């Protein structure tokens, strides 16, 4: 499904590093990384290029210029938001990464993955759903990170992932508007 396609990662922090490392395992033609601060973005990509295991997928720095973003988004099939924009309790809960206007024409063939897990769905994913996009929120990543940490800390392999997921859903449900 990802053969010959491009991906966009929004943000250049710690979670973006993990996302890019995962994306480098896919048969993508390019990974575009967008960040607000050019200095932070340059440092992020420099570190990644020094550390990366797979240099067959080009990493491309992308400014937040709306025209360039629009062109890149038109040819990308996966967009991952690693920023806190739109997260419940973090500024404007109705906010979307890069603003609503950029996403109003999103193609239904694009997969939108938001690492945020509350609210469910985020305003960005809700807009994507309205356009017929495949959308994924960050709950499963949260659960799997917790399971991996528990395995590592306890030495147990039989970690109750289903119970962890159910507990997370119950906890988030209690805090949903």
Annotate each predicted stretch with a short phrase.
Residues 4-24:
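Glycine-rich adenosine-cofactor-binding loop
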Residues 1-2, 26, 107:
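Short, flexible coil/linker segments at domain boundaries that flank nucleotide/cofactor-interacting
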């Amino acid at each position: 499904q990802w053969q010959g396609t491009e991906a966009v990662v929004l943000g250049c922090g710690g979670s973006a590093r993990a996302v890019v490392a995962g994306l480098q395992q896919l048969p993508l033609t390019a990974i575009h990384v967008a960040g607000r601060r050019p200095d932070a973005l340059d440092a992020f990509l420099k570190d990644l290029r020094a550390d990366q295991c797979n240099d067959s997928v080009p990493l491309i720095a992308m400014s937040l210029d709306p025209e360039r973003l629009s062109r890149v988004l038109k040819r990308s099939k996966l967009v991952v938001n690693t920023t806190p924009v739109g997260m419940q309790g973090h500024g404007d809960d109705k906010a979307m990464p890069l603003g609503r206007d950029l996403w109003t024409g999103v193609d239904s063939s694009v997969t939108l993955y938001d690492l945020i897990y509350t609210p469910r769905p985020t305003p960005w994913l809700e807009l994507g759903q309205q356009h017929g996009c495949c959308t994924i929120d960050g709950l499963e990543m949260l659960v799997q990170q917790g399971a991996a940490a528990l395995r590592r800390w306890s030495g147990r392999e039989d970690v109750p992932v289903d119970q962890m997921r159910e507990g997370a859903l119950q906890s988030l449900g209690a805090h949903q508007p």
